[in-house]
């Protein structure tokens, strides 16, 4: 948490989006440390209020990710967090949700990046992406 805090403490983060489910662990702790709100990105049917969703391709099919419709506003600076970057498709879909909500700016963080993961094909090139460890 300390290392992530040092990276993002001066970025003006107002919301941290943790991606189901391992992104909740450090994402929630990081949101608390940054003094930001925490938003869960979850699979369909798990959030209690009205949601928006994005469907994305996986290696063997498709999947869908949702956030609450009112979780992010136009003045928010958002950090999207997940534990592992493999294909990047889940993160890319979550990033599109944050864009649709009108966030002012978004950053992306993974704890671990698998080398040769294809990040450039799935997450827009202009998005600042950080990882703590590459394998």
Sequence positions of predicted segments:
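PRPP-associated nucleotide enzymes
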Residues: 1-135
